[in-house]
Swiss-Prot record:
Keywords annotated in UniProt: Cytoplasm, Glycosyltransferase, Purine salvage, Transferase
Record-listed E.C. numbers: 2.4.2.7
Stored Pfam families: Pribosyltran (PF00156)
CC terms in the record's Gene Ontology section: cytoplasm
Similarity field: Belongs to the purine/pyrimidine phosphoribosyltransferase family.
Catalytic activity: AMP + diphosphate = 5-phospho-alpha-D-ribose 1-diphosphate + adenine
Function of the protein: Catalyzes a salvage reaction resulting in the formation of AMP, that is energically less costly than de novo synthesis.
Protein name: Adenine phosphoribosyltransferase
Subcellular location: Cytoplasm
Taxonomic lineage from the root: Bacteria, Bacillati, Bacillota, Bacilli, Bacillales
Gene coding for it: apt
Main location, first listed in the record: cytoplasm
NCBIfam families given in the database record: apt, PRK02304.1-2, PRK02304.1-3, PRK02304.1-5
Domain of life: Bacteria
Oligomeric and partner information: Homodimer.
Length: 170
């Protein structure tokens, strides 16, 4: 199935010059959303995953159905101040400054094999920060899966040591 047919390109959003990849038009078609999810599930089965981790918010949209299909848990990575219990955190750079990602301190057990999911790989900053959180808790990043990769931003270069699946490349 050509998943790109179901992604809407929105010009000049959220700012001029950006060609935003809107996945809601993929997700609102059950058979297409299921197909994309199933592709990630098949990839993950080979990795013997214990837990799926995804950064907010679209990492949840991808990761939760994958975790459900695999019969494993899902641990959210959120911006600072959004998780109610004790967390660990990591600062990471954005094109316009810095932000902080957090995960519950007890979300991952040492040695657990983790699949990280997100909708889009751009510069790699968010996933690089997510990897740091997983590894700080003793998790093993067994794989990383994205719906979309923006190849021209070279985000994959930051992730050389990891196995990556992308379903669509632009």
């Amino acid at each position: 199935m050509d998943l790109k047919k179901y992604v809407t390109i929105v010009p000049d959003y959220p700012k001029e010059g950006v060609q935003f990849k809107d996945i809601t038009t993929l997700m609102d078609k059950g058979d297409v959303y299921r197909y994309a999810t199933d592709q990630i599930v098949e990839y993950a089965k080979e990795k013997e995953i214990d837990l799926v981790v995804g950064p907010e918010a679209r990492g949840f949209i991808i990761g939760c159905p994958v975790a459900y299909a695999l019969g494993v848990g899902f641990a959210p990575v959120r911006k600072e101040g959004k998780l109610p219990r004790e967390v660990i955190k990591v600062d990471y750079g954005l094109e316009y400054g810095k932000d902080v990602l957090t995960i519950h301190k007890d979300a991952i057990l040492p040695g657990q094999r983790v699949l990280i999911t997100d909708d889009l790989l751009a510069t790699g900053g968010t996933i690089e920060a997510t990897i740091k959180l997983v590894e700080e808790l003793g998790g093993v990043v067994a794989g990383i899966a994205f719906l979309i990769e923006l190849s021209y931003l070279d985000g994959r270069d930051k992730l050389d040591d990891y196995d990556i699946l992308t379903l669509m490349k632009y």
